[in-house]
């Protein structure tokens, strides 16, 4: 396994619309394993392939259990996802490994139902609510070249751009 480099905003790579996965082979399995290792090392709960430079329609989500630990056997590997149903509405404070240090409230569906394939190309259906539903929507957005900051109001977006400039200035002076 290997740690992969996470691509940060404003890289144009993050705006790429990812392509459908067609080969469910050892290379894909290695990519999923490397993505999981990278996500855990970065203290994230979700990671889309495009965030590590792979323009493929796949993502992983590994929510921590009540003890705060993310167990590998709980990791969802979601490939070629499609929304079947969505419902409700909720606000959730989101962050992103590609936009480090910035968190903001985003409106999302409260419940989602998706169809996807696992690493063995088996078709699965998943119903999710609350945090898992939010994470699924956030990561699928990445597959479509959309970031959570794109969903902010104009006022919140200006706040984000200002904070980003300040952060970039600090990093230049280090």
UniProtKB/Swiss-Prot annotation:
Report the function annotation for this chain: Removes the formyl group from the N-terminal Met of newly synthesized proteins. Requires at least a dipeptide for an efficient rate of reaction. N-terminal L-methionine is a prerequisite for activity but the enzyme has broad specificity at other positions.
A GO biological process held by the record: co-translational protein modification
Name the record gives this protein: Peptide deformylase
Q: What is its EC number?
A: 3.5.1.88
Query: According to the record, how does the cofactor bind?
Result: Binds 1 Fe(2+) ion.
Active site at: 139
Which SUPFAM superfamilies does the record match to this protein? Peptide deformylase
Q: Which CDD domains match?
A: Pep_deformylase (cd00487)
Does the record bear Hydrolase in its keywords? Answer: yes
The family note in this entry says: Belongs to the polypeptide deformylase family.
Q: Name one GO molecular function term.
A: peptide deformylase activity
> Keyword annotations for this protein?
Hydrolase, Iron, Metal-binding, Protein biosynthesis
- Chemical reaction(s) catalysed: N-terminal N-formyl-L-methionyl-[peptide] + H2O = N-terminal L-methionyl-[peptide] + formate
Lineage of source species: Bacteria, Pseudomonadati, Campylobacterota, Epsilonproteobacteria, Campylobacterales
Listed binding positions for Fe cation are 96, 138, 142
The cofactors it requires, by name, are: Fe(2+)
Q: Which organism is it from?
A: Helicobacter pylori (strain G27)
């Amino acid at each position: 396994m290997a740690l992969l480099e996470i691509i940060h905003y404003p890289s144009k790579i993050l705006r790429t619309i990812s392509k459908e996965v067609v080969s469910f082979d050892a290379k894909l399995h290695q990519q999923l394993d490397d993505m999981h290792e990278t996500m855990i090392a970065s203290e994230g709960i979700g990671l889309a392939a495009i965030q590590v430079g792979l323009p493929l329609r796949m993502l992983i989500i590994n929510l921590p259990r009540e003890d705060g630990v993310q167990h590998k056997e709980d990791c969802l590997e979601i490939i070629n996802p499609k929304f079947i149903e969505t419902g409700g509405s909720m606000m959730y404070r989101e962050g992103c490994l590609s936009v480090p240090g910035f968190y903001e409230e985003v409106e999302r569906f409260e419940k989602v139902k998706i169809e996807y394939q696992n690493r063995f190309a088996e078709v699965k259906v998943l119903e999710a609510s609350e945090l898992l539903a939010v994470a699924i929507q956030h990561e699928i957005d990445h597959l479509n070249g959309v970031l959570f900051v794109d969903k902010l109001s104009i006022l919140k977006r200006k706040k984000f751009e200002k904070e980003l400039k300040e952060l970039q200035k600090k990093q230049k002076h280090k």
